[in-house]
Curated annotation (Swiss-Prot):
GO terms for molecular function: structural constituent of ribosome. The keyword Coiled coil does not apply. The keyword Ribonucleoprotein applies. HAMAP family: Ribosomal_bL36 (MF_00251). It holds the Pfam family Ribosomal_L36. This is Large ribosomal subunit protein bL36. GO terms for cellular component: cytoplasm; ribonucleoprotein complex; ribosome.
Length: 39
């Protein structure tokens, strides 16, 4: 899980979701692409 100021989809499998007011990226193909937006 990477925590970044700005999250962007890294491939076509990345999905942008919101959990508890946080923007997150989840990826079915490559788990390394998981990201969460910081403060």
């Amino acid at each position: 899980m990477k925590v970044r100021p700005s999250v962007k989809p890294m491939c076509e499998h990345c999905k942008v979701i919101r959990r508890k007011g946080r923007v997150m990226i989840i990826c079915s193909a490559n788990p390394k692409h998981k990201q969460r937006q910081g403060k």
